[in-house]
């Protein structure tokens, strides 16, 4: 699992001087600025396979009880109950439309004998005779129908909760009357309901009319306890007010600014025009059969006027998650059939990439706070004639879906001449009328939009909307940043790495096996590994440092500890009462046991603390002398060394990534064995395990207790020639006991002799290992 090279990587045994550290820190800082710009996203890393992603939920939840609010004067909206909590006697509220409706509610405390009291109503002093002999508060609703009329008591509410209610609804004003908890509602007519305003003198709450049952409950039984806590502070009603500001069609807002960079918020109204692409493929033969009718991505370029500005836009429309249908009219050559035709339905998604030549898209490299809102559009299918050689031909007709905006992200459009940083709008679909059918066939009344004629003769479909984003751009608007015309530093490196990966994989066919075995006989270390690089490198030591720092963050460091801990912990935790017969299926006792301790191994992620544990629990043989064993990692290291020497593109910038990838990806399926006297116990990374005798190669029961002792006390050898290959070699050619021992130990001299003799079984095994050394 860890050869000499990878052991050096894990232990990080190299020392560096101050110059190397400064150079490393400087390169990391430069890369960090370019690659990881905080909250910004890079546009050129669009995913390859697009799913619908998150589904935005814009459901608005209206609270049952809103408040409390401070006393105020305002014109209340219709369809809302206003619950007013009176804390003292006197006027609770006054309400009028200055036309035919004047009403005021007066609170009188309990145990008041008949008396005259003065009140100020609508700016005038009024005297009323009041009386309250009960233990509850009384609220007198005083009403008059004209400005010159006198007030009279229209209704009275007796309550121990000191709550009164008022509602504007259906051309009437509704209030509560009677005695709680049996109070009911009643109403007063008015010809001018909308102009009624209210002056409230106490704290109040707001409840939508849809929750009128809750309002009745509060009037009869009082507010819930949480509303009476001293932590609830009444707010001004103005806190509910929304200042409406009509947005401009084009808005460029400076969010922040420094000497070199600034954040600009771009708000744009846009018109999106798009069309579906499709492909109809006909089978050969007599002309009665079609192979495929499918959706294809379609580009569309157009111009439109936006706030006096002429905008040139480009869209690309594609369909994801289509449904495959077919029609088979019979088995005869003259029977009409369609092998596959695509239909977009509710489970499908439409993606529209949009770009225009405005300033918003000029420097769209680092973007945050991206939002959009687009209207829906209905797409109706047309007719497509399946023109048969003879007779009336079938016609696919109809079908419709509606596109609903479901999200937006960054993307890159690739045209014939240029790649464009763009916005990708995602639309969910709902099926609509009409249904589609294939006339003169049994296919009728199906819903969705088939790919036969999705545009229905229209040049394009159109929708409108608006998007907003914040982009990091240069402060100097006159300076044309190269970002818009080139790729970033990381993308240049990715391109180099991709080219290097392709070259490495193609070199697998050119590696001579004898050269590989000879190379494996040498003790490869960091310095010999990097000696073949043809580009200029200042110091091999600094190169090794870069590789180790990259390797330390790789997946291999964690996977090594997980694998080794699973070997020893699983063996020690298994049942010690019986031996386990070898099991070649991936669902084995070994697999289940190793899974049981995976949580423990996963919880430890510190590489530096695990390397000491690895060396104690599992000691791997590296290739040091001709008689010592050679591990899988020695094969992969030898392949890596050979490819580095043969490569024309390797350099100091790409080497750390390539070495790290090679350690993770070379030879993913590996086997390991322990040897004790005449017995071999072998396991692989797929969970298979078995034991066998060296002299006969016959399987024996797998003793997990014995394995638990051997795996911690004996060397573990990587199985270059695995048990399957050994059995095949013995069955076809016959091998001696000494040859079997040497092959089990992965002796390089014996391997080279078999290869020089052109043994097809050994040669094929080594070739397969080389082919597995791919990136």
UniProtKB/Swiss-Prot annotation:
Assigned GO CC terms: host cell endoplasmic reticulum-Golgi intermediate compartment; host cell plasma membrane; host cell rough endoplasmic reticulum; host cytoskeleton; membrane; viral outer capsid
Region named Spike foot: 509-775
Region (Spike body and stalk (antigen domain)): 247-478
Positions of the UniProt region annotated as Spike head: 65-223
Motif DGE motif, chain ranges: 307-309
InterPro entries: ConA-like_dom_sf, Rota_A_VP4, Rota_VP4_MID, Rota_VP4_MID_sf, VP4_concanavalin-like, VP4_helical
Region called Hydrophobic, residue ranges: 388-408
Disulphide bond pairs: 317-379
Site (Cleavage): 230-231, 240-241, 246-247
Family as reported in the entry's similarity comment: Belongs to the rotavirus VP4 family.
HAMAP family reported for this sequence: Rota_A_VP4, Rota_VP4
Protein known as: Outer capsid protein VP4
Annotated source species: Rotavirus A (strain RVA/Human/Australia/RV-5/1981/G2P1B[4])
């Amino acid at each position: 699992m860890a050869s000499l090279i990878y052991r050096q990587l894990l232990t990080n045994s190299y020392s560096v001087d101050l110059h190397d550290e400064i150079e490393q820190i400087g390169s990391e800082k430069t890369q960090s600025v370019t690659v990881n710009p905080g909250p910004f996203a890079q546009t050129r890393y669009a995913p390859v396979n697009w799913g619908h992603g998150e589904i935005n939920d814009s459901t608005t939840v209206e609270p049952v009880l809103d408040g409390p609010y401070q006393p105020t004067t305002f014109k209340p909206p219709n369809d809302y109950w206003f619950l007013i909590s009176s804390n003292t006697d006197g006027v609770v509220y006054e309400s009028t439309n200055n036309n035919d409706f004047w009403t005021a509610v007066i609170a009188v405390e309990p145990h008041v004998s008949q008396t005259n009291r003065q009140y100020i109503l609508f700016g005038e002093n009024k005297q009323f005779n009041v009386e309250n002999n009960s233990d509850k508060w009384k609220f007198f609703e005083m009403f008059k129908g004209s400005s010159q009329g006198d007030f009279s008591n229209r209704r009275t509410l007796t309550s121990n909760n000191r709550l009164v209610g008022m509602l504007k609804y259906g051309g009437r004003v509704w209030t509560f009357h009677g005695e709680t908890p049996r109070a009911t509602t009643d109403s007063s007519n008015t010809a001018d309901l909308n102009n009624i305003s209210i002056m409230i003198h106490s704290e109040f709450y707001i409840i939508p009319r849809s929750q009128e049952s809750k309002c009745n409950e509060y009037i009869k039984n009082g507010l819930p306890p949480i509303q009476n806590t001293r932590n609830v502070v009444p707010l001004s009603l103005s806190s509910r007010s929304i200042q409406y500001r009509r947005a401009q069609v084009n808005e460029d807002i400076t969010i922040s600014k420094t000497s070199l960079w600034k954040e600009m918020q771009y708000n744009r109204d846009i018109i999106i025009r798009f069309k579906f692409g499709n492909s109809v493929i006909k089978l050969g033969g007599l002309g009665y059969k079609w192979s495929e009718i499918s959706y294809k991505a379609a580009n569309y370029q157009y111009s439109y006027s936006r706030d006096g500005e002429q905008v040139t836009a480009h869209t690309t429309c594609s369909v994801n998650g289509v449904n495959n249908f077919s029609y088979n009219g019979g088995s005869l050559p003259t029977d009409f059939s369609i092998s596959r035709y695509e239909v977009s339905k509710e489970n499908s998604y439409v993606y529209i990439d949009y770009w225009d030549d405005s300033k918003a898209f000029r420097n769209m490299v680092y973007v945050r706070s991206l939002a959009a809102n687009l209207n829906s559009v209905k797409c109706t299918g047309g007719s497509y004639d399946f023109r048969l050689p003879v007779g009336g031909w079938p016609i696919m007709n109809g079908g419709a879906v509606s596109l609903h905006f479901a999200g937006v992200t960054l993307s890159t459009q690739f045209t014939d001449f240029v790649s464009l940083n763009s916005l990708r709008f995602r639309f969910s679909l709902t099926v609509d009328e009409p249904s589609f059918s294939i006339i003169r066939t049994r296919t009728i009344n199906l819903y969705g939009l088939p790919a036969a004629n999705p545009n229905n003769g229209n040049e394009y479909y159109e929708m409108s909307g608006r998007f907003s984003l914040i982009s990091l751009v240069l402060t100097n608007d006159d300076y044309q940043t190269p970002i818009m015309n080139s790729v970033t530093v990381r993308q240049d490196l990715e391109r180099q790495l991709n080219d290097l990966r392709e070259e490495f994989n193609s070199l697998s066919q050119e590696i001579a096996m004898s050269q590989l075995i000879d190379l494996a006989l040498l003790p490869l270390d960091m310095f010999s590994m990097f000696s073949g690089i043809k580009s200029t490198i200042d110091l091999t030591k600094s190169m090794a440092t870069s590789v180790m720092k990259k390797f330390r963050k790789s997946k291999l460091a964690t996977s090594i500890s997980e694998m080794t801990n699973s070997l020893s912990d699983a063996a020690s935790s298994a049942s010690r009462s019986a031996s386990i017969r070898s099991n070649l299926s991936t669902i084995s006792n070994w697999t289940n046991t190793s899974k049981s301790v995976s949580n423990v191994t996963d919880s430890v992620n510190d590489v530096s603390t695990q390397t000491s544990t690895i060396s104690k629990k599992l000691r791997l043989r590296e290739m040091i002398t001709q008689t010592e064993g050679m591990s899988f990692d020695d094969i992969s290291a030898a392949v890596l060394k050979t490819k580095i020497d043969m490569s024309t593109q390797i350099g100091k910038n790409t080497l750390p990534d390539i070495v790290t990838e090679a350690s993770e990806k070379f030879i993913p399926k590996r086997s390991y064995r322990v040897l004790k006297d005449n017995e071999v116990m072998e396991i692989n990374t797929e969970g298979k395990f078995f034991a066998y005798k060296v002299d006969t190669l016959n399987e024996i029961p797998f003793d997990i207790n014995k394995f638990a002792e051997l795996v911690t006390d004996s060397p573990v050898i990587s199985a270059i020639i695995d048990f399957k290959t050994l059995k095949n070699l013995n069955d076809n050619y016959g091998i001696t006991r000494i040859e079997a021992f040497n092959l089990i130990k992965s002796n390089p001299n014996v391997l080279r002799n078999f290869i020089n003799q052109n043994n097809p079984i050994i040669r094929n095994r080594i070739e397969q290992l080389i082919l597995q050394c791919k990136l």
